């Protein structure tokens, strides 16, 4: 996401290649290949796009030289996509979703750091068999281990973060 000067709002603007290019040192961990599956706001995600994403990820994970798949995703529906992938992926190889709390127009954009952490997770043998994982804010954990926050009086916590579902990144 970057701030569109006309709309004055974040819009999908970064390809997987753009994101990988922002990370120095990735090549010392893995050879990275990018496939831009879509570039839409994450609130456009739903069953038809999840099915297409699952098919692409399963196809990539079937290749013996692929160690894992990283999916760059907006935060609006990140948890729904992660859950979907957790129950539909047919591999014990890591599938790591990354998001960002800051968009690419901000000087402290956290997407590159999250990507580097996801690459490290994909090449770590201990990551096999953990299902869909999330790498964000210098933390990583399997989706099944994510804590459910307790909301006071069961009130929703509203959020105004915009996101996108850009690409999956194969780690070979």
Description of each model-found segment:
Residues 1-172:
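Active-site histidine-anchored catalytic micro-motif
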């Amino acid at each position: 996401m970057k701030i569109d000067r006309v709309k004055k709002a974040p819009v999908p603007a970064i390809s997987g290649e753009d994101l990988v290019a922002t990370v120095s040192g990735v090549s010392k961990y893995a050879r990275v290949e990018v496939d831009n599956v879509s570039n839409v706001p994450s609130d456009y995600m739903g069953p038809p796009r999840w099915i297409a994403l699952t098919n692409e990820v399963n196809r990539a994970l079937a290749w013996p030289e692929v160690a894992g798949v990283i999916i760059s995703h907006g935060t609006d529906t990140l948890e729904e996509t992660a859950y979907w992938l957790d129950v539909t992926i047919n591999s014990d190889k890591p599938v790591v979703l990354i998001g960002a709390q800051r968009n690419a127009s901000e000087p402290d954009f956290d997407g590159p750091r999250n990507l580097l952490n996801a690459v490290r997770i994909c090449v770590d043998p201990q990551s096999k068999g953990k299902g869909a994982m999330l790498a964000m804010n210098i933390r990583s954990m399997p989706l099944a281990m994510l804590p459910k926050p307790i909301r006071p009086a069961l009130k929703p916590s509203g959020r105004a973060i915009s996101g996108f579902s850009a690409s999956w990144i194969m780690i070979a």
